[in-house]
Amino acid sequence: MCSSDLLVGDVALESDVSLMEELDDIHHPEGCIREAEKLAAEVYGSDRCFLGVNGTTGVIHGMLLGALRPGDRILVPRNSHRSVLGGLILAGLEPVYVQPAYEEEWRLTLQLSPEQVEAAFARYPDLKAVFLTTPNYFGLAADTKRIAAIAHEHGAVLLVDEAHGPHLGFSDLLPPGAMECGADAAAQSTHKIVGAMTQCSLLQVRYGRLRPEAMEQAMSLVTTTSPNYLLMGALDGARAQLAEKGAAMAAASVRAATVLRKALHRVPGLPVLEKELNGRGGVVALDPGKVTIQVSRLGITGPEAADALRRAGIAVELVDQDHVLFLVTYADDNPEFPAIAQRIATVLEKMRKPRRDLPPVPPVLSIPEQVLTPREAFFAPKERVPFREAAGRVAGETLSFYPPGIPLIMPGERLTKELIAFSLQLQEKRLQVSGPRDPSLQTFEVLV
């Protein structure tokens, strides 16, 4: 057991206050919360900002609920975060999925391109929204400005998952932010990169195409009636820090990232992602604070590299079978960081093995027939059946493999013999299974 005084000090405990008139009401803000929202909206150039205390998952749910109506069609990249599926279920939306491009040399999923968005509107002119995740976890940014213009030309709104971009737009060293590029709403994980506490997020909204009362009602619906004032205070503090020092923080982050990149480039045979993917698969820019290395080219896996680095006192941001991702922030711009960067490079160089043949990247199958919406599939009765015998049944859960990490099947879609056979082939090649409750694929959940 760990006592509270070992976790937080007296000031933090005293700040964990109950609801009082002086502290405003997050559901009907008129005082200090309203002022915090107003200041955050000014910083990001939005018409309204909502404080999120249930992470960006809650903010994405509120964004989808407030922007659209049940039955509306929305264009969704196939590799969107799991919170988007939750929002589709809650809001009763009909997704039109699109496969983002996949870069085989780097073994990375790229972005949704303007051309894909245009093609989607040509086929589905009744689309009410485009959902875009930019930048993605690896810092690859989409052409948000062009996609916003296309959506608006067709009378639709652009909703952005900007979880990995709350710091964008404060410096020319970084890609522009979603609101600057014309998005109608953007969900930002203020806790991921800038200085707010875990669980802190913001929803930026531009009115005109979105109704104020609908967004307010939706955010109230997904927000607790007992919000933690430490979290809301942390959001306001992060906003103030960005307003005062955003450009300097960006410059510090880029300096530190450059130090790390130089050290990693000295490791023979180790690819370090720079700007070579710009102009491919809808990617127009890279967040320089995200440093991605392809360790599979050293004959090792991502988890092997991450374990070795952890033993050396280095925690990484993200790992998959091929890559290790380092998140470099302004806090890393210090005299000790060059030695840390060199330690990382030394660990990796010592791990080099004779290069192994990488498992082939599986071809992308066509998106299966959508029989039911995600909401209909969620509430439908289900049963578990042998996966090999599930052809013709409607999926009750998601199935994907890494690489490339794009779902082969989503809830409400029909399983086919081709898809099942393909999945079993990928499993035999020991690609990582993700999604189903039974990762062995002996059984799979389907609708009754």
What are these regions, as identified by a protein language model?
Residues 212-216, 234-243, 284-289, 318-324, ...:
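Short acidic (Asp/Glu) and glycine-rich catalytic loops that position anionic groups and cofactors
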Residues 6-14:
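N-terminal glycine-rich anion-binding loops that anchor highly charged ligand groups
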Residues 7, 43-46, 56-276:
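Conserved PLP-enzyme active-site core in the AAT-like
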Residues 293-300:
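Short, surface-exposed ligand-recognition loops at beta-strand->loop->(often short) alpha-helix junctions
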Residues 257-258, 275-292, 324:
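Conserved glycine-rich beta-strand-loop-beta hairpin in the small C-terminal domain of fold type I
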Residues 13-56:
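Conserved N-terminal alpha-helix of the aminotransferase class I/II PLP-enzyme fold
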Residues 300, 304, 308-312, 317-448:
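PLP-dependent enzyme catalytic core of the Aspartate aminotransferase-like
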Residues 1-3:
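Short, small-residue-biased leader/transition segments that mark boundaries at the very start
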